[in-house]
Swiss-Prot record, chain A:
Homodimer. Interacts with APG. Component of a nuclear cell elongation controlling complex made of ILI5/BUL1, LO9-177 and BC1. Binds directly to LO9-177, and interacts with BC1 only in the presence of LO9-177. It comes from Oryza sativa subsp. japonica (Rice). Belongs to the bHLH protein family. Expressed in seedlings, lamina joints, nodes, roots, and floral organs including anthers, young panicles, pistil, lemma and palea. Expressed at low levels in leaves. Preferentially present in leaves lamina joints. This is Transcription factor ILI5. Plants over-expressing ILI5 produce increased grain size, caused by elongated cells in lemma.
UniProtKB/Swiss-Prot annotation, chain B:
Residues 146-157 have a biased composition (Polar residues). This is Basic helix-loop-helix protein 79. GO terms for cellular component: nucleus. Keywords: Gibberellin signaling pathway, Nucleus, Transcription, Transcription regulation. Belongs to the bHLH protein family. The lineage of its organism: Eukaryota, Viridiplantae, Streptophyta, Embryophyta, Tracheophyta. It comes from Oryza sativa subsp. japonica (Rice).
Length: 88, 361
């Protein structure tokens, strides 16, 4: 009973370690730290910050895109092309 | 009569038990004359009082004060009995308070122990050890102070030590405590991430949650890249190389991980012809005012050459620049190209480059 539980626990632990290293590879500034595995707490904190910064970036970029679209001359051939890109 | 007064006091002592009170009153009226019966009654009432004080103790409320009860006993003999009964009351009250205080102190000592452990463990965590020291100083005080301050201290401790408190049967050695603190922190962050990531609260288990978080981060990254690509595409000429750069990078990503980017493959495929379309436009639209800086530079370079042979190397060096990854190529190219131009033009160019860089980032 206990051995089965421990083996299952180790598998899930392995899984979690794998997922955590995957998450670490996704983060931009944790890549340079390389093999030295940072603490999970720090990693999760960095993930929080990174998600927040990505949210901000997405908002900023969509604002800029809408601004660009607003200031664009609508019947120029360039705008046509852009609209065809954006429609995709 | 004296015993009657004592009964009265005890009656007021538990004034909220109305039915008991009326019963006692009736009994007292009946047995007032018989001394023995009165004594028996007194013992009965005393039992009841003990019961009532037990009730108070278990409810945790303050029992009504004894001097209030003296209002009801008008007789002089009642005063004597009251004085006789008073030590009992005081003893009972002090007993109950003592019991409660002892309980609090036990509660205080329990969190105090893991705290000392945590202070021993966490040399690198002074923020945890400091409140512990403060609380230890406060723990000493309630031993001779009333129960109210003891309750406030426990309330404060409850908020402070919830992370390091060892429950019954849990190990209290330093490693286990440190591990417990670490796990608490991790689960706290996971909860925070759960709030941050949509749809993550449906998933149970750490592995599923991490999976969801990874997917979300990847999708956000893709979203950012796609948006910057759109912006780059909507500002066509200047950012042509960046579009190409993004395009190439995403293609390589897609080649590495073809199943992961089905959404990106479609827009990319449609971007490609438009980009190809751009290159003839580039030559056609040289006079259009709405085109970007890069075109204007090429145009002005061709129209107003400060040095005669400038236009030929310009055309030759812009082409490789387009293929160079990043803005460094542009920078070098522009410096080499427009060294003969006036300074403001170059600053505009560098602003534009900075913009591109930001977008690419």
């Amino acid at each position: 009973m206990s051995s089965r539980r421990s083996s299952r626990g180790s598998i899930s632990e392995e899984e979690i370690n794998e997922l955590i290293s995957k998450l670490q590879s996704l983060l931009p500034n944790s890549r340079r730290r390389g093999s030295s595995q940072a603490s999970t707490t720090k990693l999760l904190k960095e993930t929080c910050n990174y998600i927040k910064s990505l949210h901000r970036e997405v908002d900023d970029l969509s604002d800029r895109l809408s601004d660009l679209m607003a200031t664009m001359d609508h019947n120029s051939p360039g705008a046509e092309i852009i609209r065809s890109i954006l429609r995709s | 009569m004296a015993q009657c007064g004592g009964g009265d006091v005890s009656r007021h002592r538990k004034g909220h038990l109305d039915t008991v009170e009326s019963l006692c009153q009736g009994l007292l009226d009946d047995v007032m004359l018989d001394d023995d019966k009165c004594r028996a009654m007194f013992g009965y009432l005393q039992e009841w009082q003990d019961l009532a004080s037990m009730c108070y103790g278990s409810l945790g409320g303050e029992p009504p004060l004894a001097p209030e009860a003296s209002n009801g006993s008008g007789s002089s003999g009642g005063g004597g009995s009251f004085r006789k009964r008073r030590p009992d009351d005081a003893k009972g009250e002090s007993n109950s308070i003592c019991k409660r205080q002892r309980g609090k102190q036990q509660q205080q000592q329990q969190p105090c122990h893991p705290d000392q452990m945590a202070a021993a463990v966490g040399k690198g965590r002074p923020e945890r050890a400091r409140p512990g020291a403060k609380k230890k100083a406060e723990v000493a005080s309630p031993k001779d102070s009333p129960a109210t301050s003891a309750s406030t201290v426990t309330a404060g401790q409850k908020t402070d030590y919830i992370h390091v408190r060892a429950r019954r049967g849990q190990a209290t050695d330093s490693h286990s405590l440190a591990e417990r603190v670490r796990r608490e922190r991790i689960s706290e962050r996971m909860r925070y991430l759960q709030e941050l990531v949509p749809g993550c609260n449906k998933v149970t288990g750490k592995a599923g949650m991490l999976d969801e978080i990874i997917n979300y981060v990847q999708s956000l990254q893709k979203q950012v890249e796609f948006l910057s690509m759109k912006i780059a595409a909507s500002n066509p000429v200047v950012n042509f190389n960046i579009v190409e750069d993004l395009f190439g990078r995403q293609l390589s990503q897609a080649a590495c991980n073809p199943a992961a980017l089905p959404a990106m493959a479609l827009p990319m495929a449609q971007v490609e012809p438009s980009c190809l379309q751009m290159s003839p436009l580039q030559q056609m639209q040289t006079s259009a005012g709405s085109s970007g800086y890069g075109l204007e530079m090429v145009v002005s370079n061709q129209y107003s050459p400060p040095g005669g042979p400038m236009s030929v190397p310009a055309g030759a060096s812009v082409e490789p620049c387009l293929n160079v990854n990043g803005a460094a190529g542009w920078d070098i190219g522009s410096h080499g190209l427009f060294s003969g131009f006036d300074a403001p033009f170059q600053s505009v160019q560098s602003d534009c480059l900075l913009d591109n860089l930001k977008m690419e980032m």
